[in-house]
Curated annotation (Swiss-Prot):
Species this protein is from: Schizosaccharomyces pombe (strain 972 / ATCC 24843) (Fission yeast)
Record protein name field: Protein MON2 homolog
Single GO term (MF): guanyl-nucleotide exchange factor activity
Membrane-protein topology: Peripheral membrane protein
Gene Ontology CC annotation, any one: endosome
In-chain residues carrying the UniProt-annotated modification Phosphoserine: 43, 660
UniProt keyword annotations, A-Z: Golgi apparatus, Membrane, Phosphoprotein, Protein transport, Transport
Length: 1616
């Protein structure tokens, strides 16, 4: 509803209701309605403007109020309120309006309250019109209502009055600030303030026309004015009024302080005055502060002290006020040191009743405080003074300590509703006092920290030094410059730190809630930090020592010590160091009895593990170090000792039991909700983690420290490590008697504290540490060094701290009297630091880098064991130190080994020392481990970092390798170390220069002298020869495997890396290395050892040396031929080889053969011929013959392998290739070759059947060479003949023997024709051809007994077939050459060849005597034999009539005759072929003995047919001599068949003949039928007998008819 509508409605109501009752009112109402109707269409703003100019419009409402017309009062009041809200009242009517309202208040409560509601609205909108007369009217209304007995009205009136006063002063203050001050308004406000003061002091005020006001209400009004308008009271008139009118009231009230409501309000006003008017009211405030100090020090009521302490808490939370107070009082000569006295009073309150607050109980109270705090509002407090309590002022419970239950829920100074003073727990007073001290500390710290950050470290340090030297003038500027504030704060801290220390020490020793303890410790951190930044060393050390003793208290130390160590502790359970400072001595006596009285009866005096409070103390220390570590200086020592002790105890605490049971205490209140032990355990875990994290951050932040600060940090840390580990245990002194520190002079106190600060607070750490425990300081040192790696690269190494670190740590682990675990930890610490620092190593070739690497590896070299130890424990420690050092070296090399350019000598010295002394110091097992670990470093160097070494380093490296090769703890290490010589040699090879040695070195001594004198100028070639000398020395003076490995590596190096050596270098190698090897002990004394294993080892070494020397000569012949005396060296080598060449040393023998072969091969490949080369060939050839002679004749070696034989033959092959030897020399060599080929003791190879063995290949190569180069075909044919004869002798046909030379024989069969071609006559003349034919007859005779020609290819023809074919081809070749030379009539040659042919024919035709074996073959290869038979017969048939062959022709045909039979009998007499009729008759007359055996069929029936056919063909030939020779042979053959038939038939009877017998008889019948001339008497006789025998059987066969016909024909012929 709009203003117009509301006013219209209200006026209409008044108008209607008053028509008949009140004409005056109706008239006034009509006038107002008329005004509204007139301005009906105006806007609201225009309407308001019109209303302000029309005073008559308000008269209806004022009339109703003035006449107290009750029925219209509310409508009128509503209208007035509506007009005031819309600012539509005219200022001119305010006085009459307030008079009308004064009349209304007499009507009742509702009217009164409505009036009190309207008045502030009017005052707000018309503050400029609130002149004193009007204010008087308002005050009269309010005071009248305030005096009402109705409390509602009274309180509302008081509130309205307060609001009016504030509105008035607010308006004045606003105008003052806007420079629009009006004199009347100013004077009215001042009169109002004075009037209020007069009301309080005199009970009435004429200016306000008020004769009474309650003191409490008046003070509240004054507080309202002061608290909101302190800038207004900077005006002199107001300041004078405060001084003259208000302060007397306050002073008077302070003098009595009996009424709590008054005292409360006085305290609040004092707080305002202290906050805002201390500058203008200095003298008065000094008096008031003196009174407060007196009250705090005297036995005043607790509620009074609480009020003052709450005021002080507010004051000290204002840093600027603190600065002003110090400037006005403490810092101003002639003034009282107000702040110092206040701080002292606060400290006294804290220490006044230690038993009440549980000092010494070490109890953490459980509060309703989750995650450190949980206020009723749900937000955690931000500071100690903002912690909300739960104490309501009733009778306090018996609570020992300070927690929420002992802190007032509503501060005493805010309890306006209380008429009687509340009950104040003494713990609350202590809490307030500590809040004030904490506020001072926190306020100063906040300012100092910000200023320190703003100006920087350097400027701040200069400022503090100026303040200390009194060169800083704080009065040069009247303004509160930051520098002036810093000076004041410095003075405040330096003058009052003892009081702070005492208060802090007592408070943190109390039974506190977690949140209070944390807030207090936070303040403690700030205070110590400020002392540190101000350079106040004595206060800093005293504070740190106190906190350290509380972090690791005496009972915790004694609980973790052994019984013997605990005996050193004083009777009260505290280490003597706990009373080191006078402050502690003071507290000791003052708090012990009270603490024991409040202590839990179940508390274990010897606490084993940390409680929550100790963890919080530790975290406090870590926070201090984190905040001001750079300025800590010597204070680090205290911290490090404490961290060490704490770490030992923490590591002993079980994971699940961080908190001892005695560290928890609950408030005895059933109405309180507290945390269980699980919550505290979680809290403690969190604090532990935070503590460790802060320590980690502390270490990392050291990287930003300045160099002096860093060095102080480092020196303190190392001093703690050294003193705790090495120095003897100091005698603990007894606790000193307590004394009052106030009685000490400043100089005396400083002396006491400085002496105490320089004394170690951790004297009991060595008593505390148990076996196997180490100090946390080592870990700190490691981390700090890791964070400050760049410092170590400083060119000024003395300033980097590196020498100090290495020296201090080495002092710990080098002294055997130090505890083993500490020695090990110190070594490990140094190793870890070295590994971290190694990451900064650079390969920059600069003096700085050189110096740093030298000192770095020198420090690494310190990690060596002490050898003069005897007990097992010390040996174990030395072993650990060695292991640590070597592992560090491995890690360094793996990480940055490629950057290491200097300091290698320390590395090699370290490796040699461990290798030489490992077994001696640690025993064989651990010694082997050390050797392996050290060798891993050496191996890494030799594989990756050889390029970083200079020449002197190489000498150290080779000496180190020699040590590892000769050690006996680990064979694998020795062998691998030998192999590393190869890596070194390969690197040196790449460094070779093009220049040769200036001279040849003939002795090792000369070489050593040169390298030692000119180590920096030595050529890589000289180093390389030194390496070879080392290896040669290993070949002589080391155990077997190493000797062998050294020999192998030595000659590998020779062969692969010596191609760039000059003549003098080679001469040096020959004299210093090869000759040394030839005269070495393993070779020269190989036969002198007694042990078979040693003999084998020496033999193996000799083999390697022999083969190696041969390889050297072979691979480098072109260079060596230019070296003087090289043949003498080679001859020396041959003499050695021959001396050792025997059955006793088979390995040496084979090495000799290999050496010969290598030398021979190299000679064959050498393309340049000169005198030296020729001498070399002859030398080798002669020694080859010697070896053959020794092997096959003189000593007759019985175990030469096929490989050795092959090597021998290959050697001579290569020699023959290289030089044109004479025929006699070649013949002699072939004699030795035969011995090698036919060496029966050699193992045979079954695979020779299909493949040429190495020996056969060598023989083949030799024969090819003899044919191609020397044209000595006859020698080759002789050799082949011998091979065939040897290969197929009777001994080779037994089944237990393996075939040999089979494949070579097949090669001979294939190539013989080519060798013989065009040389047959020559070979016949030499007898070579006959020898060849005879050798071919050997396998032909064996026939089926020959070994298989192939085990792979079954289609390969048998050996005898191949031999037969070869025989035929050679025979044809001979005939060809004979005919070509017209020597076909040469009787001697023809006779010789025919005899060989007869024997060959016999071998082709006749099977072996072992028929059962022969005829069991699946294939008899008859076709091949038939072919060979025919070829030979056709070759000789034209020449059979020669007279020279007459004697051999009969034998030839007898051979054919024997091959013509179709069967054979096993157990009967052999067939006899007669050559005369008389012999035939005799043979026919002799009957065969009947046999029941079955005949063996001749599977070669074609042979039989062809042989018989040849006989018949030649019988019918034109050569009479031949025909006459054949006739008796055929007749004898026919007779034998008939006799056999008669004998077999007489036994078989009815049984039929075998097929072979039938074929044989059919052949006989056919022959007789076709050749009647063959009939003779024996044949007549046998035919008749056969016929009768056949007819005796009743079974008729076709044979019966044939025999019948033949018999009939026989009879006819016989009759003729």
């Amino acid at each position: 509803m709009s203003l117009y509508d509301s006013l219209l409605s209200n006026l209409q109501s008044i108008n209607v209701d008053t028509r008949k009752k009140n004409a005056d009112l109706k008239k006034l109402a009509d006038g107002s309605l008329k005004f509204l109707y007139t301005n009906k269409n105006l806007s609201q703003d225009s309407l308001v403007s019109k209303l302000k100019g029309n005073e008559a419009f308000y008269k209806p409402f004022l009339f109703c109020c003035a006449k107290k017309i009750e029925r219209h009062i509310y409508i009128s009041l509503n209208s007035i309120q509506l007009l005031a809200i819309n600012d539509a009242l005219s200022p001119d009517i305010l006085e009459s309006l307030f008079n009308s309202l004064n009349a209304v208040i007499q009507l009742g409560q509702d009217s009164q309250l409505r009036v009190l509601q309207i008045i502030p609205i009017i005052c707000t909108h018309y503050a400029a019109s609130m002149k004193l007369p009007i204010l008087i009217s308002l005050f009269r209304i309010c005071f009248n209502l305030h005096n009402s007995k109705n409390s509602v009205v009274s309180n509302a009136a008081a509130a309205t009055l307060r609001q009016i006063v504030i509105l008035v002063f607010d308006y004045l203050d606003y105008d003052t600030l806007a420079h629009k001050q009006e004199a009347d308004l100013f004077l009215d406000s001042l009169s109002l303030f004075k009037g209020l003061c007069s009301l309080l002091s005199a009970g009435k005020s004429e200016s306000l026309n008020v004769d009474h006001i309650s003191t409490t209400f008046g003070l509240e009004l004054l507080e309202s004015i002061l608290v909101n308008h302190h800038r207004l009271f900077q005006i002199p008139e107001f300041q004078d009024s405060v001084r003259k009118d208000l302060l007397p009231i306050i002073t008077a009230s302070l003098a009595s302080m009996s009424d709590f409501p008054v005292a409360l309000r006085i305290s609040r006003i004092l707080n305002i005055i202290f906050q805002h008017y201390v500058t203008s009211l200095t003298l008065d405030i000094e008096v008031i502060f003196s009174f407060i100090i007196s009250s705090l020090d005297n036995s005043e009521a607790a509620w009074k002290k609480a009020l003052f302490l709450e005021v002080l808490r507010s004051i000290f939370s204002n840093t600027n006020l603190l600065y002003l107070m110090y400037t006005l009082f403490d810092g101003n000569e002639g003034r009282k040191p107000i702040i110092k006295k206040l701080v002292t009073s606060l400290s006294r309150i804290v220490n006044e009743k230690p038993s009440v607050i549980g000092v010494g109980s070490r109890v953490v109270l459980a509060d309703t405080f989750e995650d450190y705090s949980s206020t009723s509002s749900g937000n955690p407090p931000s500071s100690m003074e903002k912690v909300s309590g739960s104490f309501t002022g009733t009778k306090p419970e018996q609570i020992i300590g300070i927690c929420r239950a002992t802190i007032l829920k509503t501060p005493c100074i805010e309890q306006f509703d209380k008429q009687e003073p509340p009950i104040i727990p003494f713990a609350y007073l202590v809490y307030l006092a500590m809040c004030s001290l904490a506020s001072i500390s926190n306020g100063i710290a906040d300012f100092v920290f910000q200023f320190y950050e703003d100006v920087g470290k350097k400027e701040f340090t200069l400022l503090i030094e100026g303040i200390k030297c009194e060169n800083f003038d704080s009065k040069e500027d009247s303004t509160a410059r930051p520098q002036n504030i810093i000076k004041c704060q410095y003075g405040l801290i330096s003058e009052n730190w003892t009081s702070f220390l005492v208060a802090y020490s007592t408070f943190v020793s109390s039974a506190l809630a977690v949140e209070l303890l944390k807030f207090c410790l936070n303040s403690y951190v700030n205070f110590v930090s400020v002392c540190t930044l101000f350079g106040l060393e004595t206060p800093r050390d005293a504070l740190l020592t106190t906190l350290s003793n509380k972090a690791v208290p005496s009972n915790l130390l004694s609980g973790n010590m052994t019984h013997s160590a605990s005996s050193s502790i004083s009777h009260n359970g505290r280490l003597s160091t706990s009373t080191m400072f006078s402050v502690e001595g003071l507290k000791e006596a003052a708090t012990t009895i009270a603490a024991i009285a409040s202590y839990d009866s179940n508390h274990d005096e010897k606490q084993k593990c940390f409680s929550l409070r100790e963890i919080l103390f530790l975290r406090c220390l870590s926070s201090i170090a984190k905040v001001v570590g750079e300025k800590m200086g010597k204070g680090w020592k205290i911290l490090f000792e404490t961290f060490d002790k704490a770490d030992i105890i923490l590591n002993r605490s079980p994971t699940s039991k961080h908190l001892s049971t005695s560290s928890l205490n609950r408030v005895n209140s059933s109405n309180s909700n507290f945390q269980d032990s699980k919550s505290f355990s979680t809290l403690m875990d969190y604090e532990l983690v935070s503590y460790k994290n802060e320590l980690s951050e502390l270490m990392y932040v050291t990287s930003s420290y300045s160099q002096p600060a860093y060095m102080e940090f480092l020196e303190s840390l190392l001093a703690v490590i050294t003193s705790s580990s090495v120095h003897p245990i100091q005698t603990l002194t007894a606790p000193r008697q307590s004394f009052n520190e106030d009685l000490l002079s400043a100089n005396t106190k400083n002396s006491v504290y400085k002496t105490s600060a320089n004394r170690s607070i951790s004297g009991g750490i060595r008593l505390l540490r148990k076996s196997s425990e180490v100090f946390y300081s080592f870990s700190i040192l490691e981390t700090v060094c890791s964070c400050n790696l760049d410092r170590f690269l400083d060119s000024k190494l003395d300033h980097s701290g590196w020498s100090l670190i290495s020296k201090s740590l080495s002092e710990v682990f080098k002294i055997i009297n130090v505890a083993p675990e500490l020695r090990t930890r110190a070594a490990n610490c140094l190793a870890n630091i070295l590994v971290d620092v190694a990451s900064r190593l650079s390969n920059e070739n600069s003096p700085d880098s050189y110096a740093f690497q030298e000192i770095f590896f020198e420090s690494l070299g310190m990690l060596l064991p002490v050898t003069e130890v005897s007990d097992n424990t010390s040996r174990g420690v030395e072993y650990d130190i060695s292991t640590i050092g070597l592992e560090a070296l491995v890690s360094i090399l793996e990480t940055v080994g490629h950057h290491v350019l200097h300091g290698w000598q320390y590395v090699f010295e370290m490796l040699r020392f461990n290798c030489l002394n490992g077994a001696t110091c640690f025993g064989s097992e651990k010694g082997a481990k050390i050797v392996r670990l050290a060798f891993s470093c050496l191996q890494l160097i030799c594989t990756d970092f050889l390029a970083s070494l200079d020449t002197s380093n190489y000498l150290d490296l080779m000496d180190t390798l020699l040590v590892f090769c000769r050690q006996l703890e680990d064979a694998n290490v020795s062998l691998t170390a030998v192999g590393l010589f190869w890596n070194v040699s390969d690197t040196l090879k790449n460094m070779f220069s093009t220049s040769d040695f200036s001279c040849a070195y003939n002795s090792v001594e000369d070489l050593y002298a040169f390298t030692s004198m000119k180590s920096k100028e030595i050529l890589p070639e000289v180093l390389w020869i030194m390496l070879l000398v080392h290896l040669a020395d290993l070949c002589e003076n080391s155990w077997a495997s190493v000797r062998n490995g050294a020999a192998q590596i030595l000659f590998r190096i020779f062969n692969s890396q010596c191609s760039k050596l000059g003549t003098n270098a080679w001469a040096s190698c020959c004299q210093l290395v090869i000759m040394k090897l030839l005269h070495s002990q393993p070779i020269q004394n190989v036969s002198d050892v007694n042990n078979k294993k040693d003999e084998d080892d020496h033999e193996q070494t000799s083999c390697l040396i022999i083969s190696g020397i041969a390889d050297v000569f072979s691979e480098n012949m072109s260079l060596l031929l230019n070296v003087n005396g090289i043949l003498d060296v080679l001859e020396e080598a041959f003499q050695l080889m021959l001396r050792l060449h025997s059955d006793i040393y088979p390995k040496i023998c084979i090495s000799n053969f290999k050496a010969l072969r290598e030398l021979s091969f190299s000679i064959s490949e050498f393309g340049k011929e000169n005198a030296t080369f020729t001498l070399l060939i002859k030398l080798v050839f002669i020694n080859w013959g010697r070896f053959c002679e020794v092997s096959f004749s003189e000593r007759r070696l019985a175990n030469i392998s096929q490989e050795g034989l092959t090597l021998l033959i290959e050697s001579v092959v290569f020699l023959l290739k290289a030089y044109n030897f004479g025929i006699e020399e070649i013949k002699d060599s072939l004699l030795q070759v035969r011995k090698a080929v036919f060496y029966e003791e050699s193992t045979s190879f079954a695979l020779d059947v299909d493949f040429l063995s190495s020996l056969q290949l060598a023989v083949e190569s030799l024969t090819d060479l003899l044919i191609s180069k020397f044209k000595l075909n006859h020698l080759v044919l002789e050799l082949w003949s011998d091979v065939l004869t040897y290969a197929f002798n009777e001994e080779k046909t037994i089944r237990a023997s393996l075939p040999t030379l089979i494949c070579l024989s097949k090669k001979i069969f294939e190539n013989a024709e080519n060798v013989v071609e065009n040389h047959s006559l020559d070979f016949l003349n030499r007898g070579t051809m006959q020898h060849m034919f005879e050798s071919l007859l050997v396998p032909m005779r064996l026939k089926y007994r020959c070994p298989k020609a192939s085990r792979v290819n079954q289609s390969t023809l048998p050996i005898w077939v191949l031999a037969s074919k070869c025989f035929v081809r050679l025979m044809i070749n001979c005939f060809k050459d004979l005919k070509g030379s017209d020597a076909i009539e040469d009787a001697e040659k023809m006779q010789c060849l025919f005899l060989l042919t007869v024997e060959a024919t016999n071998s082709i035709i006749s099977p072996n005597a072992d028929y059962e074996y022969v005829w069991s073959l699946e294939d008899v290869f008859e076709n091949e034999d038939v072919s060979s038979l025919k070829q030979l017969h056709n070759l000789w048939k034209p020449h059979l009539q020669l007279n020279c062959l007459s004697d051999e022709v009969a034998q030839y045909y007898i051979t054919l005759c024997k091959g013509s039979f179709y069967y054979q009998m096993r157990n009967t007499e052999d067939m006899v072929i007669s050559r005369s009729n008389l012999d035939i008759q005799k043979e026919a007359a002799r009957n065969f003995f009947p046999s029941t055996e079955s005949p063996v069929s001749n599977r070669r029936q074609r042979i039989a047919v062809d042989c018989f056919s040849i006989l018949l063909d030649d019988y019918n030939s034109s050569y009479e001599h031949v025909s006459l020779t054949i006739r008796p042979i055929l007749q004898s053959r026919l007779c034998w068949s008939l006799k056999r038939y008669v004998a077999d038939k007489s036994v078989s009877g009815y049984l039929p003949l075998s097929k072979s017998q039938e074929m044989d008889m059919s052949t006989v019948a056919e022959c007789l039928n076709n050749h009647p001339s063959l009939y003779s008497n024996p044949i007549h006789y046998l035919l008749r007998k056969a016929y009768h025998t056949t007819n005796a059987s009743p079974v008729a066969t076709s044979l019966n008819a044939i025999l019948g016909q033949l018999t009939l024909k026989n009879e006819v012929l016989n009759a003729i």
